[in-house]
Amino acid sequence: MKIIRARTAGFCMGVSLALRKLDREVTENNAPIATLGPIIHNPQVMAHYEERGVRCLRDTAQVVPGQRVVIRAHGIPVAEETALKATGASVVDATCPKVKRAQLGIAEERGRGGTLLLFGEADHPEVRGLLSYAGEGAMVFGSLDELKGLPLRDDVAYFLAAQTTQDRAGFEDVVSWLRQRLGHDIPVLQTICDATRKRQQEAVDIARRVQAMVVVGGFDSGNTRRLADVARAQGVFTVHVETVDQLPVDELRKKSVIGLTAGASTPKSLIDAVQRFLESL
């Protein structure tokens, strides 16, 4: 069996940076360490840090005196960050720089009187954080069809942004439709991470050359789910797994060429394990 592994598979810059900050806290501090929410969307990574004594807090009410709290890579809402600092905890901001740039860009456009239209998953922590910088009137949509159902007004000065891990092609479709619907251009913040674009494009390129695609990453990871979506859209059998034991072995044994990629929060060890198993079939 031939395996074509994506060169872009695995940790992105933002994830690597966040985990380096957390590793430094664990190594250099005697104080109790916690993250506010999962630092990244990968349960195996979270289990690794839990074994090292890192707590994952649901909210700021769980902060204890003397604790050092690391803000997740996805960022947090403004009100939550204010509440966290008010606890007196030592705060370490591990927000991805690309997410931070999106937050500040949205705040700047809001300051000019703009109303945000956000292309993203409404229940995703990054999106909740981005919306908190947008003020009243902001609307979020997960697809072009959802956007078409929103009550857009001709007398409102909209601007557009996207979750950093959103689908680039879908975003371009949104821009085109809004131009037609509103009859003019609106400010468009280029908030989709370039690493996301490259990862998705490589997944598409590989999917067109193989008989099956395996995508490795957390089921809660939006960028991993979208990798599976763009691969599946090429008409190839695609499976999204977190670990090697979830692979549909009987189905994959029928294939001679399999593509392998992984989300931005998937550790190399998990990708390697899946590749070794596939090569053994």
UniProtKB/Swiss-Prot annotation:
Binding site for [4Fe-4S] cluster: C12, C96, C193
GO molecular function, one term: metal ion binding
Active site: E126 (proton donor)
Residues engaged in binding (2E)-4-hydroxy-3-methylbut-2-enyl diphosphate: H41, H74, H124, T164, S221, N223, S265
One Pfam family this sequence matches: LYTB
Superkingdom in the source lineage: Bacteria
Binding positions for isopentenyl diphosphate per the UniProt entry: H41, H74, H124, S221, N223, S265
CDD domains named among the record's database cross-references: lytB_ispH (cd13944)
Cofactor notes: Binds 1 [4Fe-4S] cluster per subunit.
Family membership noted in the UniProt record: Belongs to the IspH family.
Protein name: 4-hydroxy-3-methylbut-2-enyl diphosphate reductase
UniProt source species: Nitratidesulfovibrio vulgaris (strain DSM 19637 / Miyazaki F)
Taxonomic lineage: Bacteria, Pseudomonadati, Thermodesulfobacteriota, Desulfovibrionia, Desulfovibrionales
